[in-house]
């Protein structure tokens, strides 16, 4: 009896802590009623986009016979405006032409843009292309701000061991920071944005929304491209809102029946944003909805194991999920039995949807929930034993997996249907280098942002503490700086794998998109937990139509 009372008091304190550190939802029922545009407007927008899409396709055919610099600018503009997904085939052909013509005598600005785009698209191009621009000491000196910006972006698609790109990054970052306040407004805006988030690491929709505003101010803009990008953005925004209406209804029912509000973060809209960062294209509407449902369950499990259930309850609940039958949960308290029933109901509905789509991988879905629960339960053992792993690598063997990124990539592949083969799913399940790199970025970036909160909340020891122990650093700041170096190494691994291409770029790009999403969410704060910090961005992507 005393033990039960102690657990109840402990749980009460946990719930008080939960409400103290996690704000309530910012959205409520908003998307049940929000209609960005009238049906008639939506139909007109789609008709106009269809016409403009064909016009741009003709333009791309003409660009094929233009000079290299014009090709690069055209591709770069389409990508920044978020229109490139309409022209995958055409851009692939242009990039092939660009690669074949790469040995031309180009200036430093064009060389930097060429290098960036080729590497971004998975082409092997040596960083030695920059050697000819160095002085007697090997330093590349220029005071042209646009050139510095192009070099800075190029340096962010480096791989381990490319000293020349390491030096370019250090030099250009320092110089851009020094001159940014003196630049003309449009270029100043571009440089500030680049210093905050390099082009290669930006989310497609966030980048498109920002660049549409910048492009509108350009004296050399193509007005048809500008109008096309606005309409396309608004069409996707409207589609996302339709998805959020369906998801809001599902989440309200799940939350009410499972009674998760007392301990779990209410972040359904933010979760949709997370999934939209990985799959933004209109054809992946089902992927976004399916993944949002699954990872809202994962988010609930994270909070459940982290601060609500006792160790004994966590063990029993994990065992029940592993059995995945009605009898398995009998040893759990009522609130966990209810949660268990609702989790199984959601997973069953997803499996049925996938079966209707003739998706042969439907049976793999429940494995995500089971494996994530096992990861979270394993972490509680470290917490209870107050165990500090000796090395960051040891820590990451468990904690990187519990970031959920490997599971998200695998489940994302499943949701893509025939786009992802059985071989691709098997590859993803082996924890390949690019997926490991994404998991590392997610875990380390999360730990940097959540260190202070978790250090005072008796949760699992973070990689920050482990790093301090491994490297003998005397301050948290030194440990965090080392963690940031590990994050940069992970980004270089991502670039390396995109050049090696163990799978088609169409699949690898999902892993890269996930890394970009994690970078965004955990750049300055934990944007998922404290979603007030990203509310303005979410408004611009879900609420505010572009005029």
Curated annotation (Swiss-Prot):
Family membership: Belongs to the terpene synthase family.
GO molecular function: (-)-E-beta-caryophyllene synthase activity; magnesium ion binding
EC nos: 4.2.3.57
InterPro entries per the UniProt record, alphabetical: Isoprenoid_synthase_dom_sf (IPR008949), Terpene_cyclase-like_1_C (IPR034741), Terpene_cyclase_plant_C1 (IPR044814), Terpene_synth_N (IPR001906), Terpene_synth_N_sf (IPR036965), Terpene_synthase-like (IPR050148), Terpene_synthase_metal-bd (IPR005630), Terpenoid_cyclase/PrenylTrfase (IPR008930)
Subcellular location field: Cytoplasm
Species for this entry: Zea mays (Maize)
Annotated signal peptide: none
Residues that, per the record, bind Mg(2+) 2: 302, 306
EC category name: lyase
Functional note: Component of the volatile terpenes biosynthesis pathways. Sesquiterpene synthase that converts farnesyl diphosphate to (E)-beta-caryophyllene. Involved in indirect defense by producing volatile signals attracting natural enemies of herbivores.
Cofactor remark from the record: Binds 3 Mg(2+) or Mn(2+) ions per subunit.
Binding residues annotated for Mg(2+) 1, in chain numbering: 302, 306
Protein name: (E)-beta-caryophyllene synthase
Entry text on domains: The Asp-Asp-Xaa-Xaa-Asp/Glu (DDXXD/E) motif is important for the catalytic activity, presumably through binding to Mg(2+).
GO biological process: defense response; diterpenoid biosynthetic process
GO CC list: cytoplasm
Binding site for Mg(2+) 3: 446, 454
Cofactor: Mg(2+); Mn(2+)
Residues binding substrate: 302, 306, 443, 446
Domain of life of the organism encoding this protein: Eukaryota
The entry's keywords: Cytoplasm, Lyase, Magnesium, Manganese, Metal-binding, Plant defense
Catalytic activity, reaction form: (2E,6E)-farnesyl diphosphate = (-)-(E)-beta-caryophyllene + diphosphate
Motif (DDXXD motif): 302-306
Major localisation: cytoplasm
Metabolic or biological pathway, per its Swiss-Prot or TrEMBL entry: Secondary metabolite biosynthesis; terpenoid biosynthesis
Assembly, per entry: Monomer.
């Amino acid at each position: 009896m005393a033990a039960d009372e102690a657990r109840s008091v402990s749980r009460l304190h946990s719930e008080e802590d939960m409400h103290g550190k996690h704000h309530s939802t910012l959205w409520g029922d908003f998307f049940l009623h929000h209609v960005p545009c009238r049906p008639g407007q939506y139909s007109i927008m789609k008709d106009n986009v269809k016409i403009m899409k064909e016009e741009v396709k003709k333009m791309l055919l003409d660009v094929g016979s233009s000079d290299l610099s014009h090709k690069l600018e055209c591709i770069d503009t389409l990508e920044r405006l978020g229109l490139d997904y309409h022209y995958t085939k055409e851009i692939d052909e242009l990039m092939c032409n660009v690669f074949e013509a790469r040995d031309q005598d180009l200036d430093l600005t064009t060389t930097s843009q060429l290098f960036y785009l080729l590497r971004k698209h998975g082409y092997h191009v040596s960083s030695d292309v920059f050697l000819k621009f160095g002085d007697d000491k090997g330093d590349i000196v220029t005071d042209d701000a646009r050139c510095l910006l192009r070099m800075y972006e190029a340096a962010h698609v480096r791989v381990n061991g490319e000293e020349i790109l390491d030096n370019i990054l250090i030099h250009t970052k320092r110089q851009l920071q020094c001159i940014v306040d003196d630049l003309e407004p449009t270029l100043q805006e571009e440089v500030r944005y680049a210093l905050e988030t390099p082009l290669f690491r930006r989310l497609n929709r966030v980048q498109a929304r920002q660049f549409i505003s910048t492009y509108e101010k350009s004296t050399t803009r193509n007005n048809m491209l500008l109008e096309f990008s606005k309409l396309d953005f608004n069409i996707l925004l409207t589609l996302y809102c339709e998805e959020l209406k369906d998801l809001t209804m599902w989440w309200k029912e799940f939350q009410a029946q499972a009674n998760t509000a007392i301990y779990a973060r209410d972040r359904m809209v933010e979760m949709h944003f997370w999934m939209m960062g990985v799959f933004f294209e209109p054809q992946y509407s089902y992927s976004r909805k399916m993944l949002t449902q699954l990872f809202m369950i994962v988010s609930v499990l994270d909070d459940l194991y982290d601060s609500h259930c006792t160790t004994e309850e966590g063990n029993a609940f994990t065992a029940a999920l592993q059995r995945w039958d009605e009898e398995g949960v009998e040893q759990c308290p009522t609130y966990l039995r209810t949660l268990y029933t609702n989790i199984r109901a959601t997973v069953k509905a997803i499996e049925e949807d996938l079966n209707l789509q003739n998706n042969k991988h439907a049976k793999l879905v429940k494995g995500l929930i089971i494996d994530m629960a096992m990861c979270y339960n394993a972490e509680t053992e470290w917490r209870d034993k107050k165990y500090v792993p000796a090395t960051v690598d040891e820590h990451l063997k468990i904690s990187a997996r519990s970031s959920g990124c490997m599971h998200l990539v695998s489940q994302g592949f499943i949701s893509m249907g025939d786009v992802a083969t059985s071989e691709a799913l098997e590859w993803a399940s082996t924890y390949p280098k690019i997926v490991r790199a994404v998991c590392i970025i997610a875990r380390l970036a999360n730990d940097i942002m959540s260190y202070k909160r978790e250090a005072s909340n008796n949760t699992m020891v973070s990689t920050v503490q482990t790093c301090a122990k491994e490297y003998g650093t005397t301050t948290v700041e030194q440990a965090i700086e080392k963690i940031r170096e590990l994050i940069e190494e992970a980004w270089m691994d991502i670039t390396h794998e995109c050049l090696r291409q163990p799978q088609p770029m169409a699949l690898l790009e999902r892993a890269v998109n996930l890394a970009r999403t994690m970078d965004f969410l955990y750049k300055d704060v934990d944007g998922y937990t404290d979603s007030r910090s990203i509310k303005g961005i979410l408004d611009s992507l879900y609420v505010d139509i572009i005029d």
